[in-house]
A protein has these predicted regions:
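Sequence termini and other peripheral, non-core segments
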Residues: 4-72, 76-177
Length: 177
């Protein structure tokens, strides 16, 4: 357990590492809430985590567009733990792709490259119950509920990612999530 927390804390000190912005339990709504910078960035990161799941589970038999990436990152580990995690992240990647197209009028390259290869689970991936994604953020934002923690993080660190013309989240009605 200590190693998991240590890894999570280390990677969150660098805002360019992988993450899953779990802003709503519905992967499509979670994508809608994301700032433009994350919509652009998180499609590739989600695709990398899903491709890594294929590589880690299927080994040399994996036929996916991207190489392994951040194999030991808590979010990448979470994505490959079971089919429910994988499916949530896949649906979230697709939803981010829809958001990208709606906001920028074009299709993200990772959607073109990865949709079909990642549509199917890696052969041998176990079933399992859905658990909230890990909270990879500074400790000050963490909460028992990952959705609340990610909103704490999103509101607290908005100056890092919000564009000049974007709606800035100051608070959120947690009951609506």
């Amino acid at each position: 357990m200590y190693r998991w927390v240590f890894i999570c804390n280390v990677v969150t000190n660098n805002y360019t590492t992988m993450n899953i912005f779990y802003l709503h339990r519905d992967p499509y709504k979670a994508a809608e809430y994301q700032y433009n910078k994350h919509v652009v960035k998180m499609i590739l990161e989600s695709a990398q985590m899903l491709c890594t799941a294929h590589h880690e589970i299927m080994g040399d038999d994996a036929d996916v567009p991207y190489k392994r990436a951040h194999v030991n990152h808590p979010s990448t580990i979470w994505a490959r733990q079971n089919k429910n995690h994988y499916r949530w992240l896949f649906n979230h990647m697709v939803a981010l792709g829809h958001e990208y197209t709606a906001r920028y009028g074009k299709t993200h390259l990772s959607i073109n490259k990865c949709f079909l290869p990642l549509y199917r689970y890696p052969v041998g991936m176990p079933d399992g119950a859905f658990e909230q994604p890990p909270q990879c953020m500074p400790d000050e934002y963490k909460d028992d509920c990952s959705i609340k923690a990610y909103w704490n993080y999103y509101i607290g660190e908005k100056h890092i990612v919000a564009g000049k013309n974007e709606k800035i989240y100051e608070k959120i009605d947690m009951e609506a999530l």
